[in-house]
UniProtKB/Swiss-Prot annotation:
Highest taxon above the source species: Bacteria
Name listed for the protein in its UniProt record: UPF0210 protein SEQ_0468
Naturally occurring in which organism (per UniProt): Streptococcus equi subsp. equi (strain 4047)
One Pfam entry name: DUF711
Record-annotated disulphide pairs: none
Length: 445
């Protein structure tokens, strides 16, 4: 490595807010299934605290060794609905508390997997888990929940969509930040290192390490050097920058997996912002020539960014996965917040942007009087985009306060302006229930 590359790396870390957002250990809990819920909870606690005992220490050692911040260490587990279904319990609070206690004792930032996969219907454990979510998130510190309500192969479970509209409202009432730790997915992935939607898929190995990187500031700085150049140059610049970022992510993942004695899973090629100035995806889009995010051209700029990040990342690492694209969470991105406050960015434009990027309506505050049917309809719209376009989409919305308020969540979750919601009703549409069938192009066998 020549001195120029060394200098570039130092600048990425010190000036451009580059970091490894998360090292996430995925742990299978299938061998913790028990007909007695207390025994199952004890097994879950034991397995997590054994497998991930050294996760935080190893992460800190690697960060010190490489001089690269590793912001979060996290754990994801098998969807708890699968574990709880073997019991006769009427709620899964004790399992959520076992997850939380394990997370607190090993020192990780979050634990994901209080989850259910209901894209084609409910099993016993799914319904119980979903009804447990509001209190599970209110009575724990570090547990994150997710529910997959649709897939390209299965269509959209509209009964579950209606239920989740209500559950999000109940969760927001039960605790201050509970709804910020709850994601509703279509086409959820099994190897996602990012919260709040991470869970460990049943097709995964017993224990794996997945890595998520963060580098919007690095990309913006690179684009500053090619102002006025053509889109070809723009795409190539993003691609080369994503290559560098992903290479570091792969190195960290391999080091962590070797030291922890578990398999290396994937690097998630997502550009994840933080509330810090200089670490914003919105500012990357504006650097491409937009006056402010939300104006015409925003969706095209995001499409270029997303695609170039994937192309560069795939070249850098032979194991990519997770969500892999640009994240556009409103509360976690100072540029997005400014665009909302400036009147340029609204829910409808964000929905259009989600047809391009890797998540969906993410970390968005809406008025607390928003009806649960309207929230369910937002979920249905996002799920439809994902199901038809064969991609992951998600909704993480927080019904709190009234339009124009600022809601502070703290830490990486940031601050969100409460956004206007279309006042017209979707209640009769949501009340139908049942299943929206899978699209014709899903029928490939």
């Amino acid at each position: 490595m020549d001195i120029r590359q060394v200098r570039e790396t130092v600048e990425m870390i010190e000036e451009q807010h580059f970091d490894i957002r998360t090292i996430t250990m995925g742990i299978s809990l299938l061998d913790c299934i028990d007909s007695d819920i207390d025994r199952a909870a004890a097994k879950i606690y034991q397995k997590i605290t054994t497998k991930a005992a050294n996760l935080v220490a190893v992460g800190d050692d690697i960060a010190a060794e490489l001089g690269i911040p590793i912001v979060n260490k996290r754990v994801s587990v098998t969807p708890i609905a699968l574990i709880g279904a073997a019991t006769d319990a009427e709620d899964y609070l004790s399992l959520a508390k076992a997850l939380d206690q394990a997370a607190c004792d090993i020192g990780v930032d979050f634990i994901g997997g209080f989850s259910a996969l209901v894209q084609k219907g409910y099993q016993k454990g799914d319904k119980i888990l979903i009804e447990s979510i509001p209190q599970a998130l209110a009575q724990t510190q570090k547990v994150c929940a997710s529910v997959n309500v649709g897939s390209t192969r299965s269509g959209i479970n509209m009964t579950a969509v209606a239920d989740m509209g209500r559950i999000i409202k109940e969760t927001a009432k039960a605790s201050e930040i509970g709804a910020a730790k709850l994601v509703v997915f279509a086409n959820a992935v099994e190897d996602n290192p990012f919260m709040a939607g991470a869970f460990h898929g049943v097709g995964e190995a017993d224990t794996v390490i997945n890595v998520g990187v963060s580098g919007p500031g690095v990309v913006k700085r690179a684009l500053e050097k090619v102002r006025g150049e053509s889109f070809d140059v723009l795409a190539e610049t993003v691609k080369k920058t994503a290559f560098k970022i992903t290479r570091i992510g792969q190195l960290v993942g391999q080091m962590a997996s070797e030291r922890l004695g578990v398999g290396f899973g994937v690097v998630d090629l997502s550009l994840a912002p933080t509330p810090a100035v200089g670490d914003s995806v919105a500012r990357v889009l504006e650097e491409m020539g937009l006056e402010i995010v939300g104006t015409h051209g925003t969706t095209a700029a995001l499409a270029l960014l997303n695609d170039a990040v994937k192309k560069g990342g795939v070249m850098a690492c032979n194991r990519v996965g997770g969500l892999s694209g640009a994240f556009i969470p409103v509360s976690e991105d100072e540029g997005m917040i400014a665009a909302v406050q400036g009147g340029s960015l609204n829910l409808e434009k964000l929905e259009a942007m989600t047809a391009i990027c890797s998540v969906g309506l993410d970390m968005i505050a809406i008025p607390e009087e928003t009806p649960s049917e309207t929230i369910a309809a937002m979920i249905a719209d996002e799920a439809a985009i994902g199901v038809i376009n064969q991609k992951t989409t998600a909704v993480r919305i927080i019904p709190k306060g009234k339009e124009g308020d600022m809601i502070a969540f703290g830490g990486l979750l940031g601050t969100a302006p409460v956004m206007a919601v279309n006042p017209h009703s979707s209640a009769d549409f949501i009340a139908r229930g049942g299943q929206i069938p899978a699209p014709i192009h899903s029928f490939k066998n």
